[in-house]
Amino acid sequence: MAGNPIPALRPVVLRCMFRFRSGEGVRMRTRDREAKLAGQRIGFVGAVLVFALGGLLGAARAQTDCADGNGVLDTSPPKNMTAQELVQKFAAEETKIKEARTHYTYTQDVLVQTLNGKAVDGQFHEIATVSYDNQGKRAEKVSFAEQPTLRGIQLTAEDMDDIHTFMPWILTTEEVPQYNLTYAGQQHVDDLDTYVFHVEPKKEEKGKRYFQGRVWVDNHDLQIVKLCGKSVPDVVHVKKRQPMNIRPMFVGYRQVVDGQWFPAYARVDDTLNFQVQAIHVREIVKFTGYKRVGAGAAAAKQ
């Protein structure tokens, strides 16, 4: 992967956290059981990309606000079950969600921007329809793609795979053994009551990437409704003319679709600080218009 030519940019460290504006997503609302499922929406934030900066060494200083919408953390243990039992139960629900999502089509809208100060100086924007075949294999049909003008960074196929995998991350029973999940407590997030877990990979195998961060699990549905973290490991090449591969922090939310919490919205607002300069990156990813296909479509509408 070749690094982009580096423009003359002033080093900046900006914190541009914002709550969701109209058109960017909707905050989480309390789930009043089946009567209000259709009206619930959640904002969804997060993003992951590969940053190619030839010949520079440095580190990303995450600025994405994981605490947005969070109440005070209550460290008391879960009621009526152990933390391990809670993990087993919500992982089982997540497994159902991952399988269910393969029976839907939806629109994926990816917007990545680089900023110089407060001004956008480049962007990547692509919209695609996502579907799955009978074996659960994912396919995309691009309906809109503008000429990329990003400054100082370069998106690759691996970056788009991050968008497909980690921003809408679903922690299944099969994946749980790969991670250390540490119970952190209970927390009110927007209008939901949740359990909070710290997540980190037990071991990073060569050629594989993992999620590292926190997840918030709805205390009634036992499904993830919010996550904040990044994919790991970062790859920093020390040889000259070799690009750095750094992921920013992202935060994501879900929405209720036919009674299940599906990934809905993702955002990054991060300044990546390198040895010579800093690059401010903003990213918004939306997963919208879920439509069930196949034999179960009629049942889902009932």
Predicted features and spans:
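Sec/Tat signal peptide C-region and signal peptidase I cleavage site
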Residues: 58-62
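Structured extracytoplasmic
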Residues: 63-212, 220-225, 230-247, 255-265, ...
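N-terminal secretory signal peptides that target proteins for export/translocation
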Residues: 1-40
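Extended interaction regions within the primary functional domain
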Residues: 13, 50-51, 63, 261
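Bacterial N-terminal signal peptides
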Residues: 45-56
